[in-house]
Amino acid sequence: MVGVNGERGRRWRVVVLALAAVYFLLPLFAAAEFSLRAPGGGHGLANWVAIARDPVLIGALLTSLQIAVITAVLVLVLVVPTAVWVRLRLPGLAGVMESVTILPIVIPPVVMAAGIAFVQANLGGPVFRALFASSTTALTPFYVVLALPFAYRAVDNGLAAIPLRTLVEAARNLGASTATALLRVVLPAIRSAVLGAAFLTLALVLGEIVIARILLYTDTFPVAIVEVGRSTAGVAVALSLASLLITWALLLAVSFAGNRRSRSGGSG
């Protein structure tokens, strides 16, 4: 009886996995097929070639990647020391930090974008003019705010999985400063969590469109996809697939880096 139940359970798992694969992969195959349709009929790489030959699209992709990298660095600089400090010195504020960092999820991006647009239109001065002079300087601070909920929880979960206080106290007893303990002891121990937070930030920036669209910054990759889709749907679908492939490549890079670190730590 146990063997029959086990066999039945395995069959159900196979069925569920097959249905999940169809659910996720079928739309991707359909999108890939649509992106390969030629304007005159048949199939070809015309839509993908159009992306490679369009300097506006390439520039938008590079701009979004630049914003994503800067945002990820700023988020980690803010989140990692804060999360470590809260766990070590102010554990009573853990609930407050959870509530504060979740606010960007609670507040709709449209509301945030409307407030930013009001500031952009009504507040002058050299600081605000310099801030809104380009999409990189204008969007990066707000993307940092949007990424805080995801990055903070990823880093905080990583800290919860290690004996943080023991590691820091051991490093301090050996003569290391707080900064040295953070950089050379804590950070390597939570490298997978830090890489996960960076990946979530990159994925968010590469997909965010509301704030950029309302603030009229059209030189970002998500906005470029929408603009192209108005005239050439095939190119827009190819752009969406390219964005997905870039995100997957980043995820694989993060996973590879984390696994390599784990193997090297285990062998050492």
Segments and roles (model prediction):
Residues 156-167, 178:
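Membrane-helix/interface signature in polytopic inner-membrane proteins
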Residues 257-268:
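Short cytosolic juxtamembrane segments of multi-pass membrane proteins
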Residues 1-7:
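Short, Lys/Arg-rich, polar N-terminal cytosolic tail immediately upstream
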Residues 174-175, 188:
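Glycine/proline-centered hinge or cleavage motifs at structural transition points of membrane proteins
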